[in-house]
From Swiss-Prot:
Domain Reelin residues, every copy: 13-179
The EC number(s) this enzyme carries: 1.-.-.-
Keyword Metal-binding: yes
Cofactor binding: number and manner: Binds 2 heme b groups non-covalently.
Transmembrane segments: 2-22, 372-392, 415-435, 446-466, 491-511, 515-535, 569-589
Positions of heme b 1 binding: H373, H446
Top enzyme category: oxidoreductase
Membrane topology, record value: Multi-pass membrane protein
Subcellular localization: Membrane
Naturally occurring in which organism (per UniProt): Homo sapiens (Human)
Name of this chain's protein: Ferric-chelate reductase 1
Residue ranges of domain DOMON in the record: 216-331
Molecular function GO labels: metal ion binding; oxidoreductase activity, acting on metal ions
Amino acid sequence: MAVSGFTLGTCILLLHISYVANYPNGKVTQSCHGMIPEHGHSPQSVPVHDIYVSQMTFRPGDQIEVTLSGHPFKGFLLEARNAEDLNGPPIGSFTLIDSEVSQLLTCEDIQGSAVSHRSASKKTEIKVYWNAPSSAPNHTQFLVTVVEKYKIYWVKIPGPIISQPNAFPFTTPKATVVPLPTLPPVSHLTKPFSASDCGNKKFCIRSPLNCDPEKEASCVFLSFTRDDQSVMVEMSGPSKGYLSFALSHDQWMGDDDAYLCIHEDQTVYIQPSHLTGRSHPVMDSRDTLEDMAWRLADGVMQCSFRRNITLPGVKNRFDLNTSYYIFLADGAANDGRIYKHSQQPLITYEKYDVTDSPKNIGGSHSVLLLKVHGALMFVAWMTTVSIGVLVARFFKPVWSKAFLLGEAAWFQVHRMLMFTTTVLTCIAFVMPFIYRGGWSRHAGYHPYLGCIVMTLAVLQPLLAVFRPPLHDPRRQMFNWTHWSMGTAARIIAVAAMFLGMDLPGLNLPDSWKTYAMTGFVAWHVGTEVVLEVHAYRLSRKVEILDDDRIQILQSFTAVETEGHAFKKAVLAIYVCGNVTFLIIFLSAINHL
């Protein structure tokens, strides 16, 4: 999809990469077989948790209480296996004792064959019942994986072996129970990455475009260098948390090959993962990566690794000699957890083959539909509606005798500006729905305020069609209703713009956006105050003294023509300032 989203970034940075942080709700069925959380760390070797059972012998149909206890932990996965084949499927099923802290999982198509945590809250003890099946083996052993936090976990802690009556004694050594995975070696880089070969030897993506990773700590840099049948990947950027890139068949999240570099405890962990939808990424084995290295210096994090172009038989790793959209993102991380990014990731405008001829490319942090949506809303609710309101409220006497297409000039200008506002709002309103394919559930109050603004923007011209004649008794009610709805729409629109500027899909630079929008509001309110004061001062010149009381005439008189030049000057200055604010915002959107 050429203009659809940058939602993968929404994904890349919702992640929590610890076993528990990735799956705080305990839905870890993908780990049922190996019982290994793929964190990129080695598991602990000395268990500090124990499993106890209520009896050591059992018959099919028995229910045995199983207790897991020890140091505080956040996550766990408990299973029963055939003690003579610990790599086989789970045996039997479990019954919960406290469903508030634990839940049943379906592993190997056996319902309730495993138990896991329900949340990431700390626990010191878990109790469940194990139900012995009719086909139970002679010897059954309980195994548990326990996660204390991201880099501290234990895999397949062996529990008691329970046996059926008259079974031969079980003699398999416990040492075979816990296979500890090993990690590929990681070395240290000695100098910053260079962008001098970008477009010549390296395929480079940078944010901002053409930034220098050797000189700019804020430069997010990604390069691919082909070397025969492998590709060397370099990635660098701010060391505040993590860097990531992903290869995607489209600009939507799901079925994507992602790679992460996470800064934790003065170390950088390099981790491949894959994305299966709008959910947390699934961490994969690092066995597919070679020559891994990293460096932390001067506020910059660097990581590099080598990967074969093709990996036959390896799931979730894409062949690199195919064209993909490339996502590049960075964000905060703490204790191994990656937090949602404050800005959409950069996504290339089109698909690229990183093994093809070297290129030096950029991308955009916002999808075209959302950029157009924001631009049209700024034009409508910063400029056209604001000028239209001023013209109707303060310039009737100025252009009362000037006519345009058979109507008073002020009225025609007001009507054209308000009609333009309604049309722009209608066009902009549908764009997020087209982009999201429906309602946006992650945009806070912004879409709700937008719907209110859209409704009022459509009702205003419909109401104007039924405007009563000038001297009709209902005219005053119309005027108040028209003014109230218009004022409400403008206030809500400003609130929606404030909120919309912070949404990931159109996240304008933090350093100035709030000040600029506040400046626009102050500019408009200040102009209205100046014109109100000016109108009041003119009205004082036509006061009528009646029984020692001053009555202010509500209609303008010929005396007010003295201020026409002043009003026109104020309007000209206001329009220049308004357009300046508009250009600032439109320029910022264009550079996303």
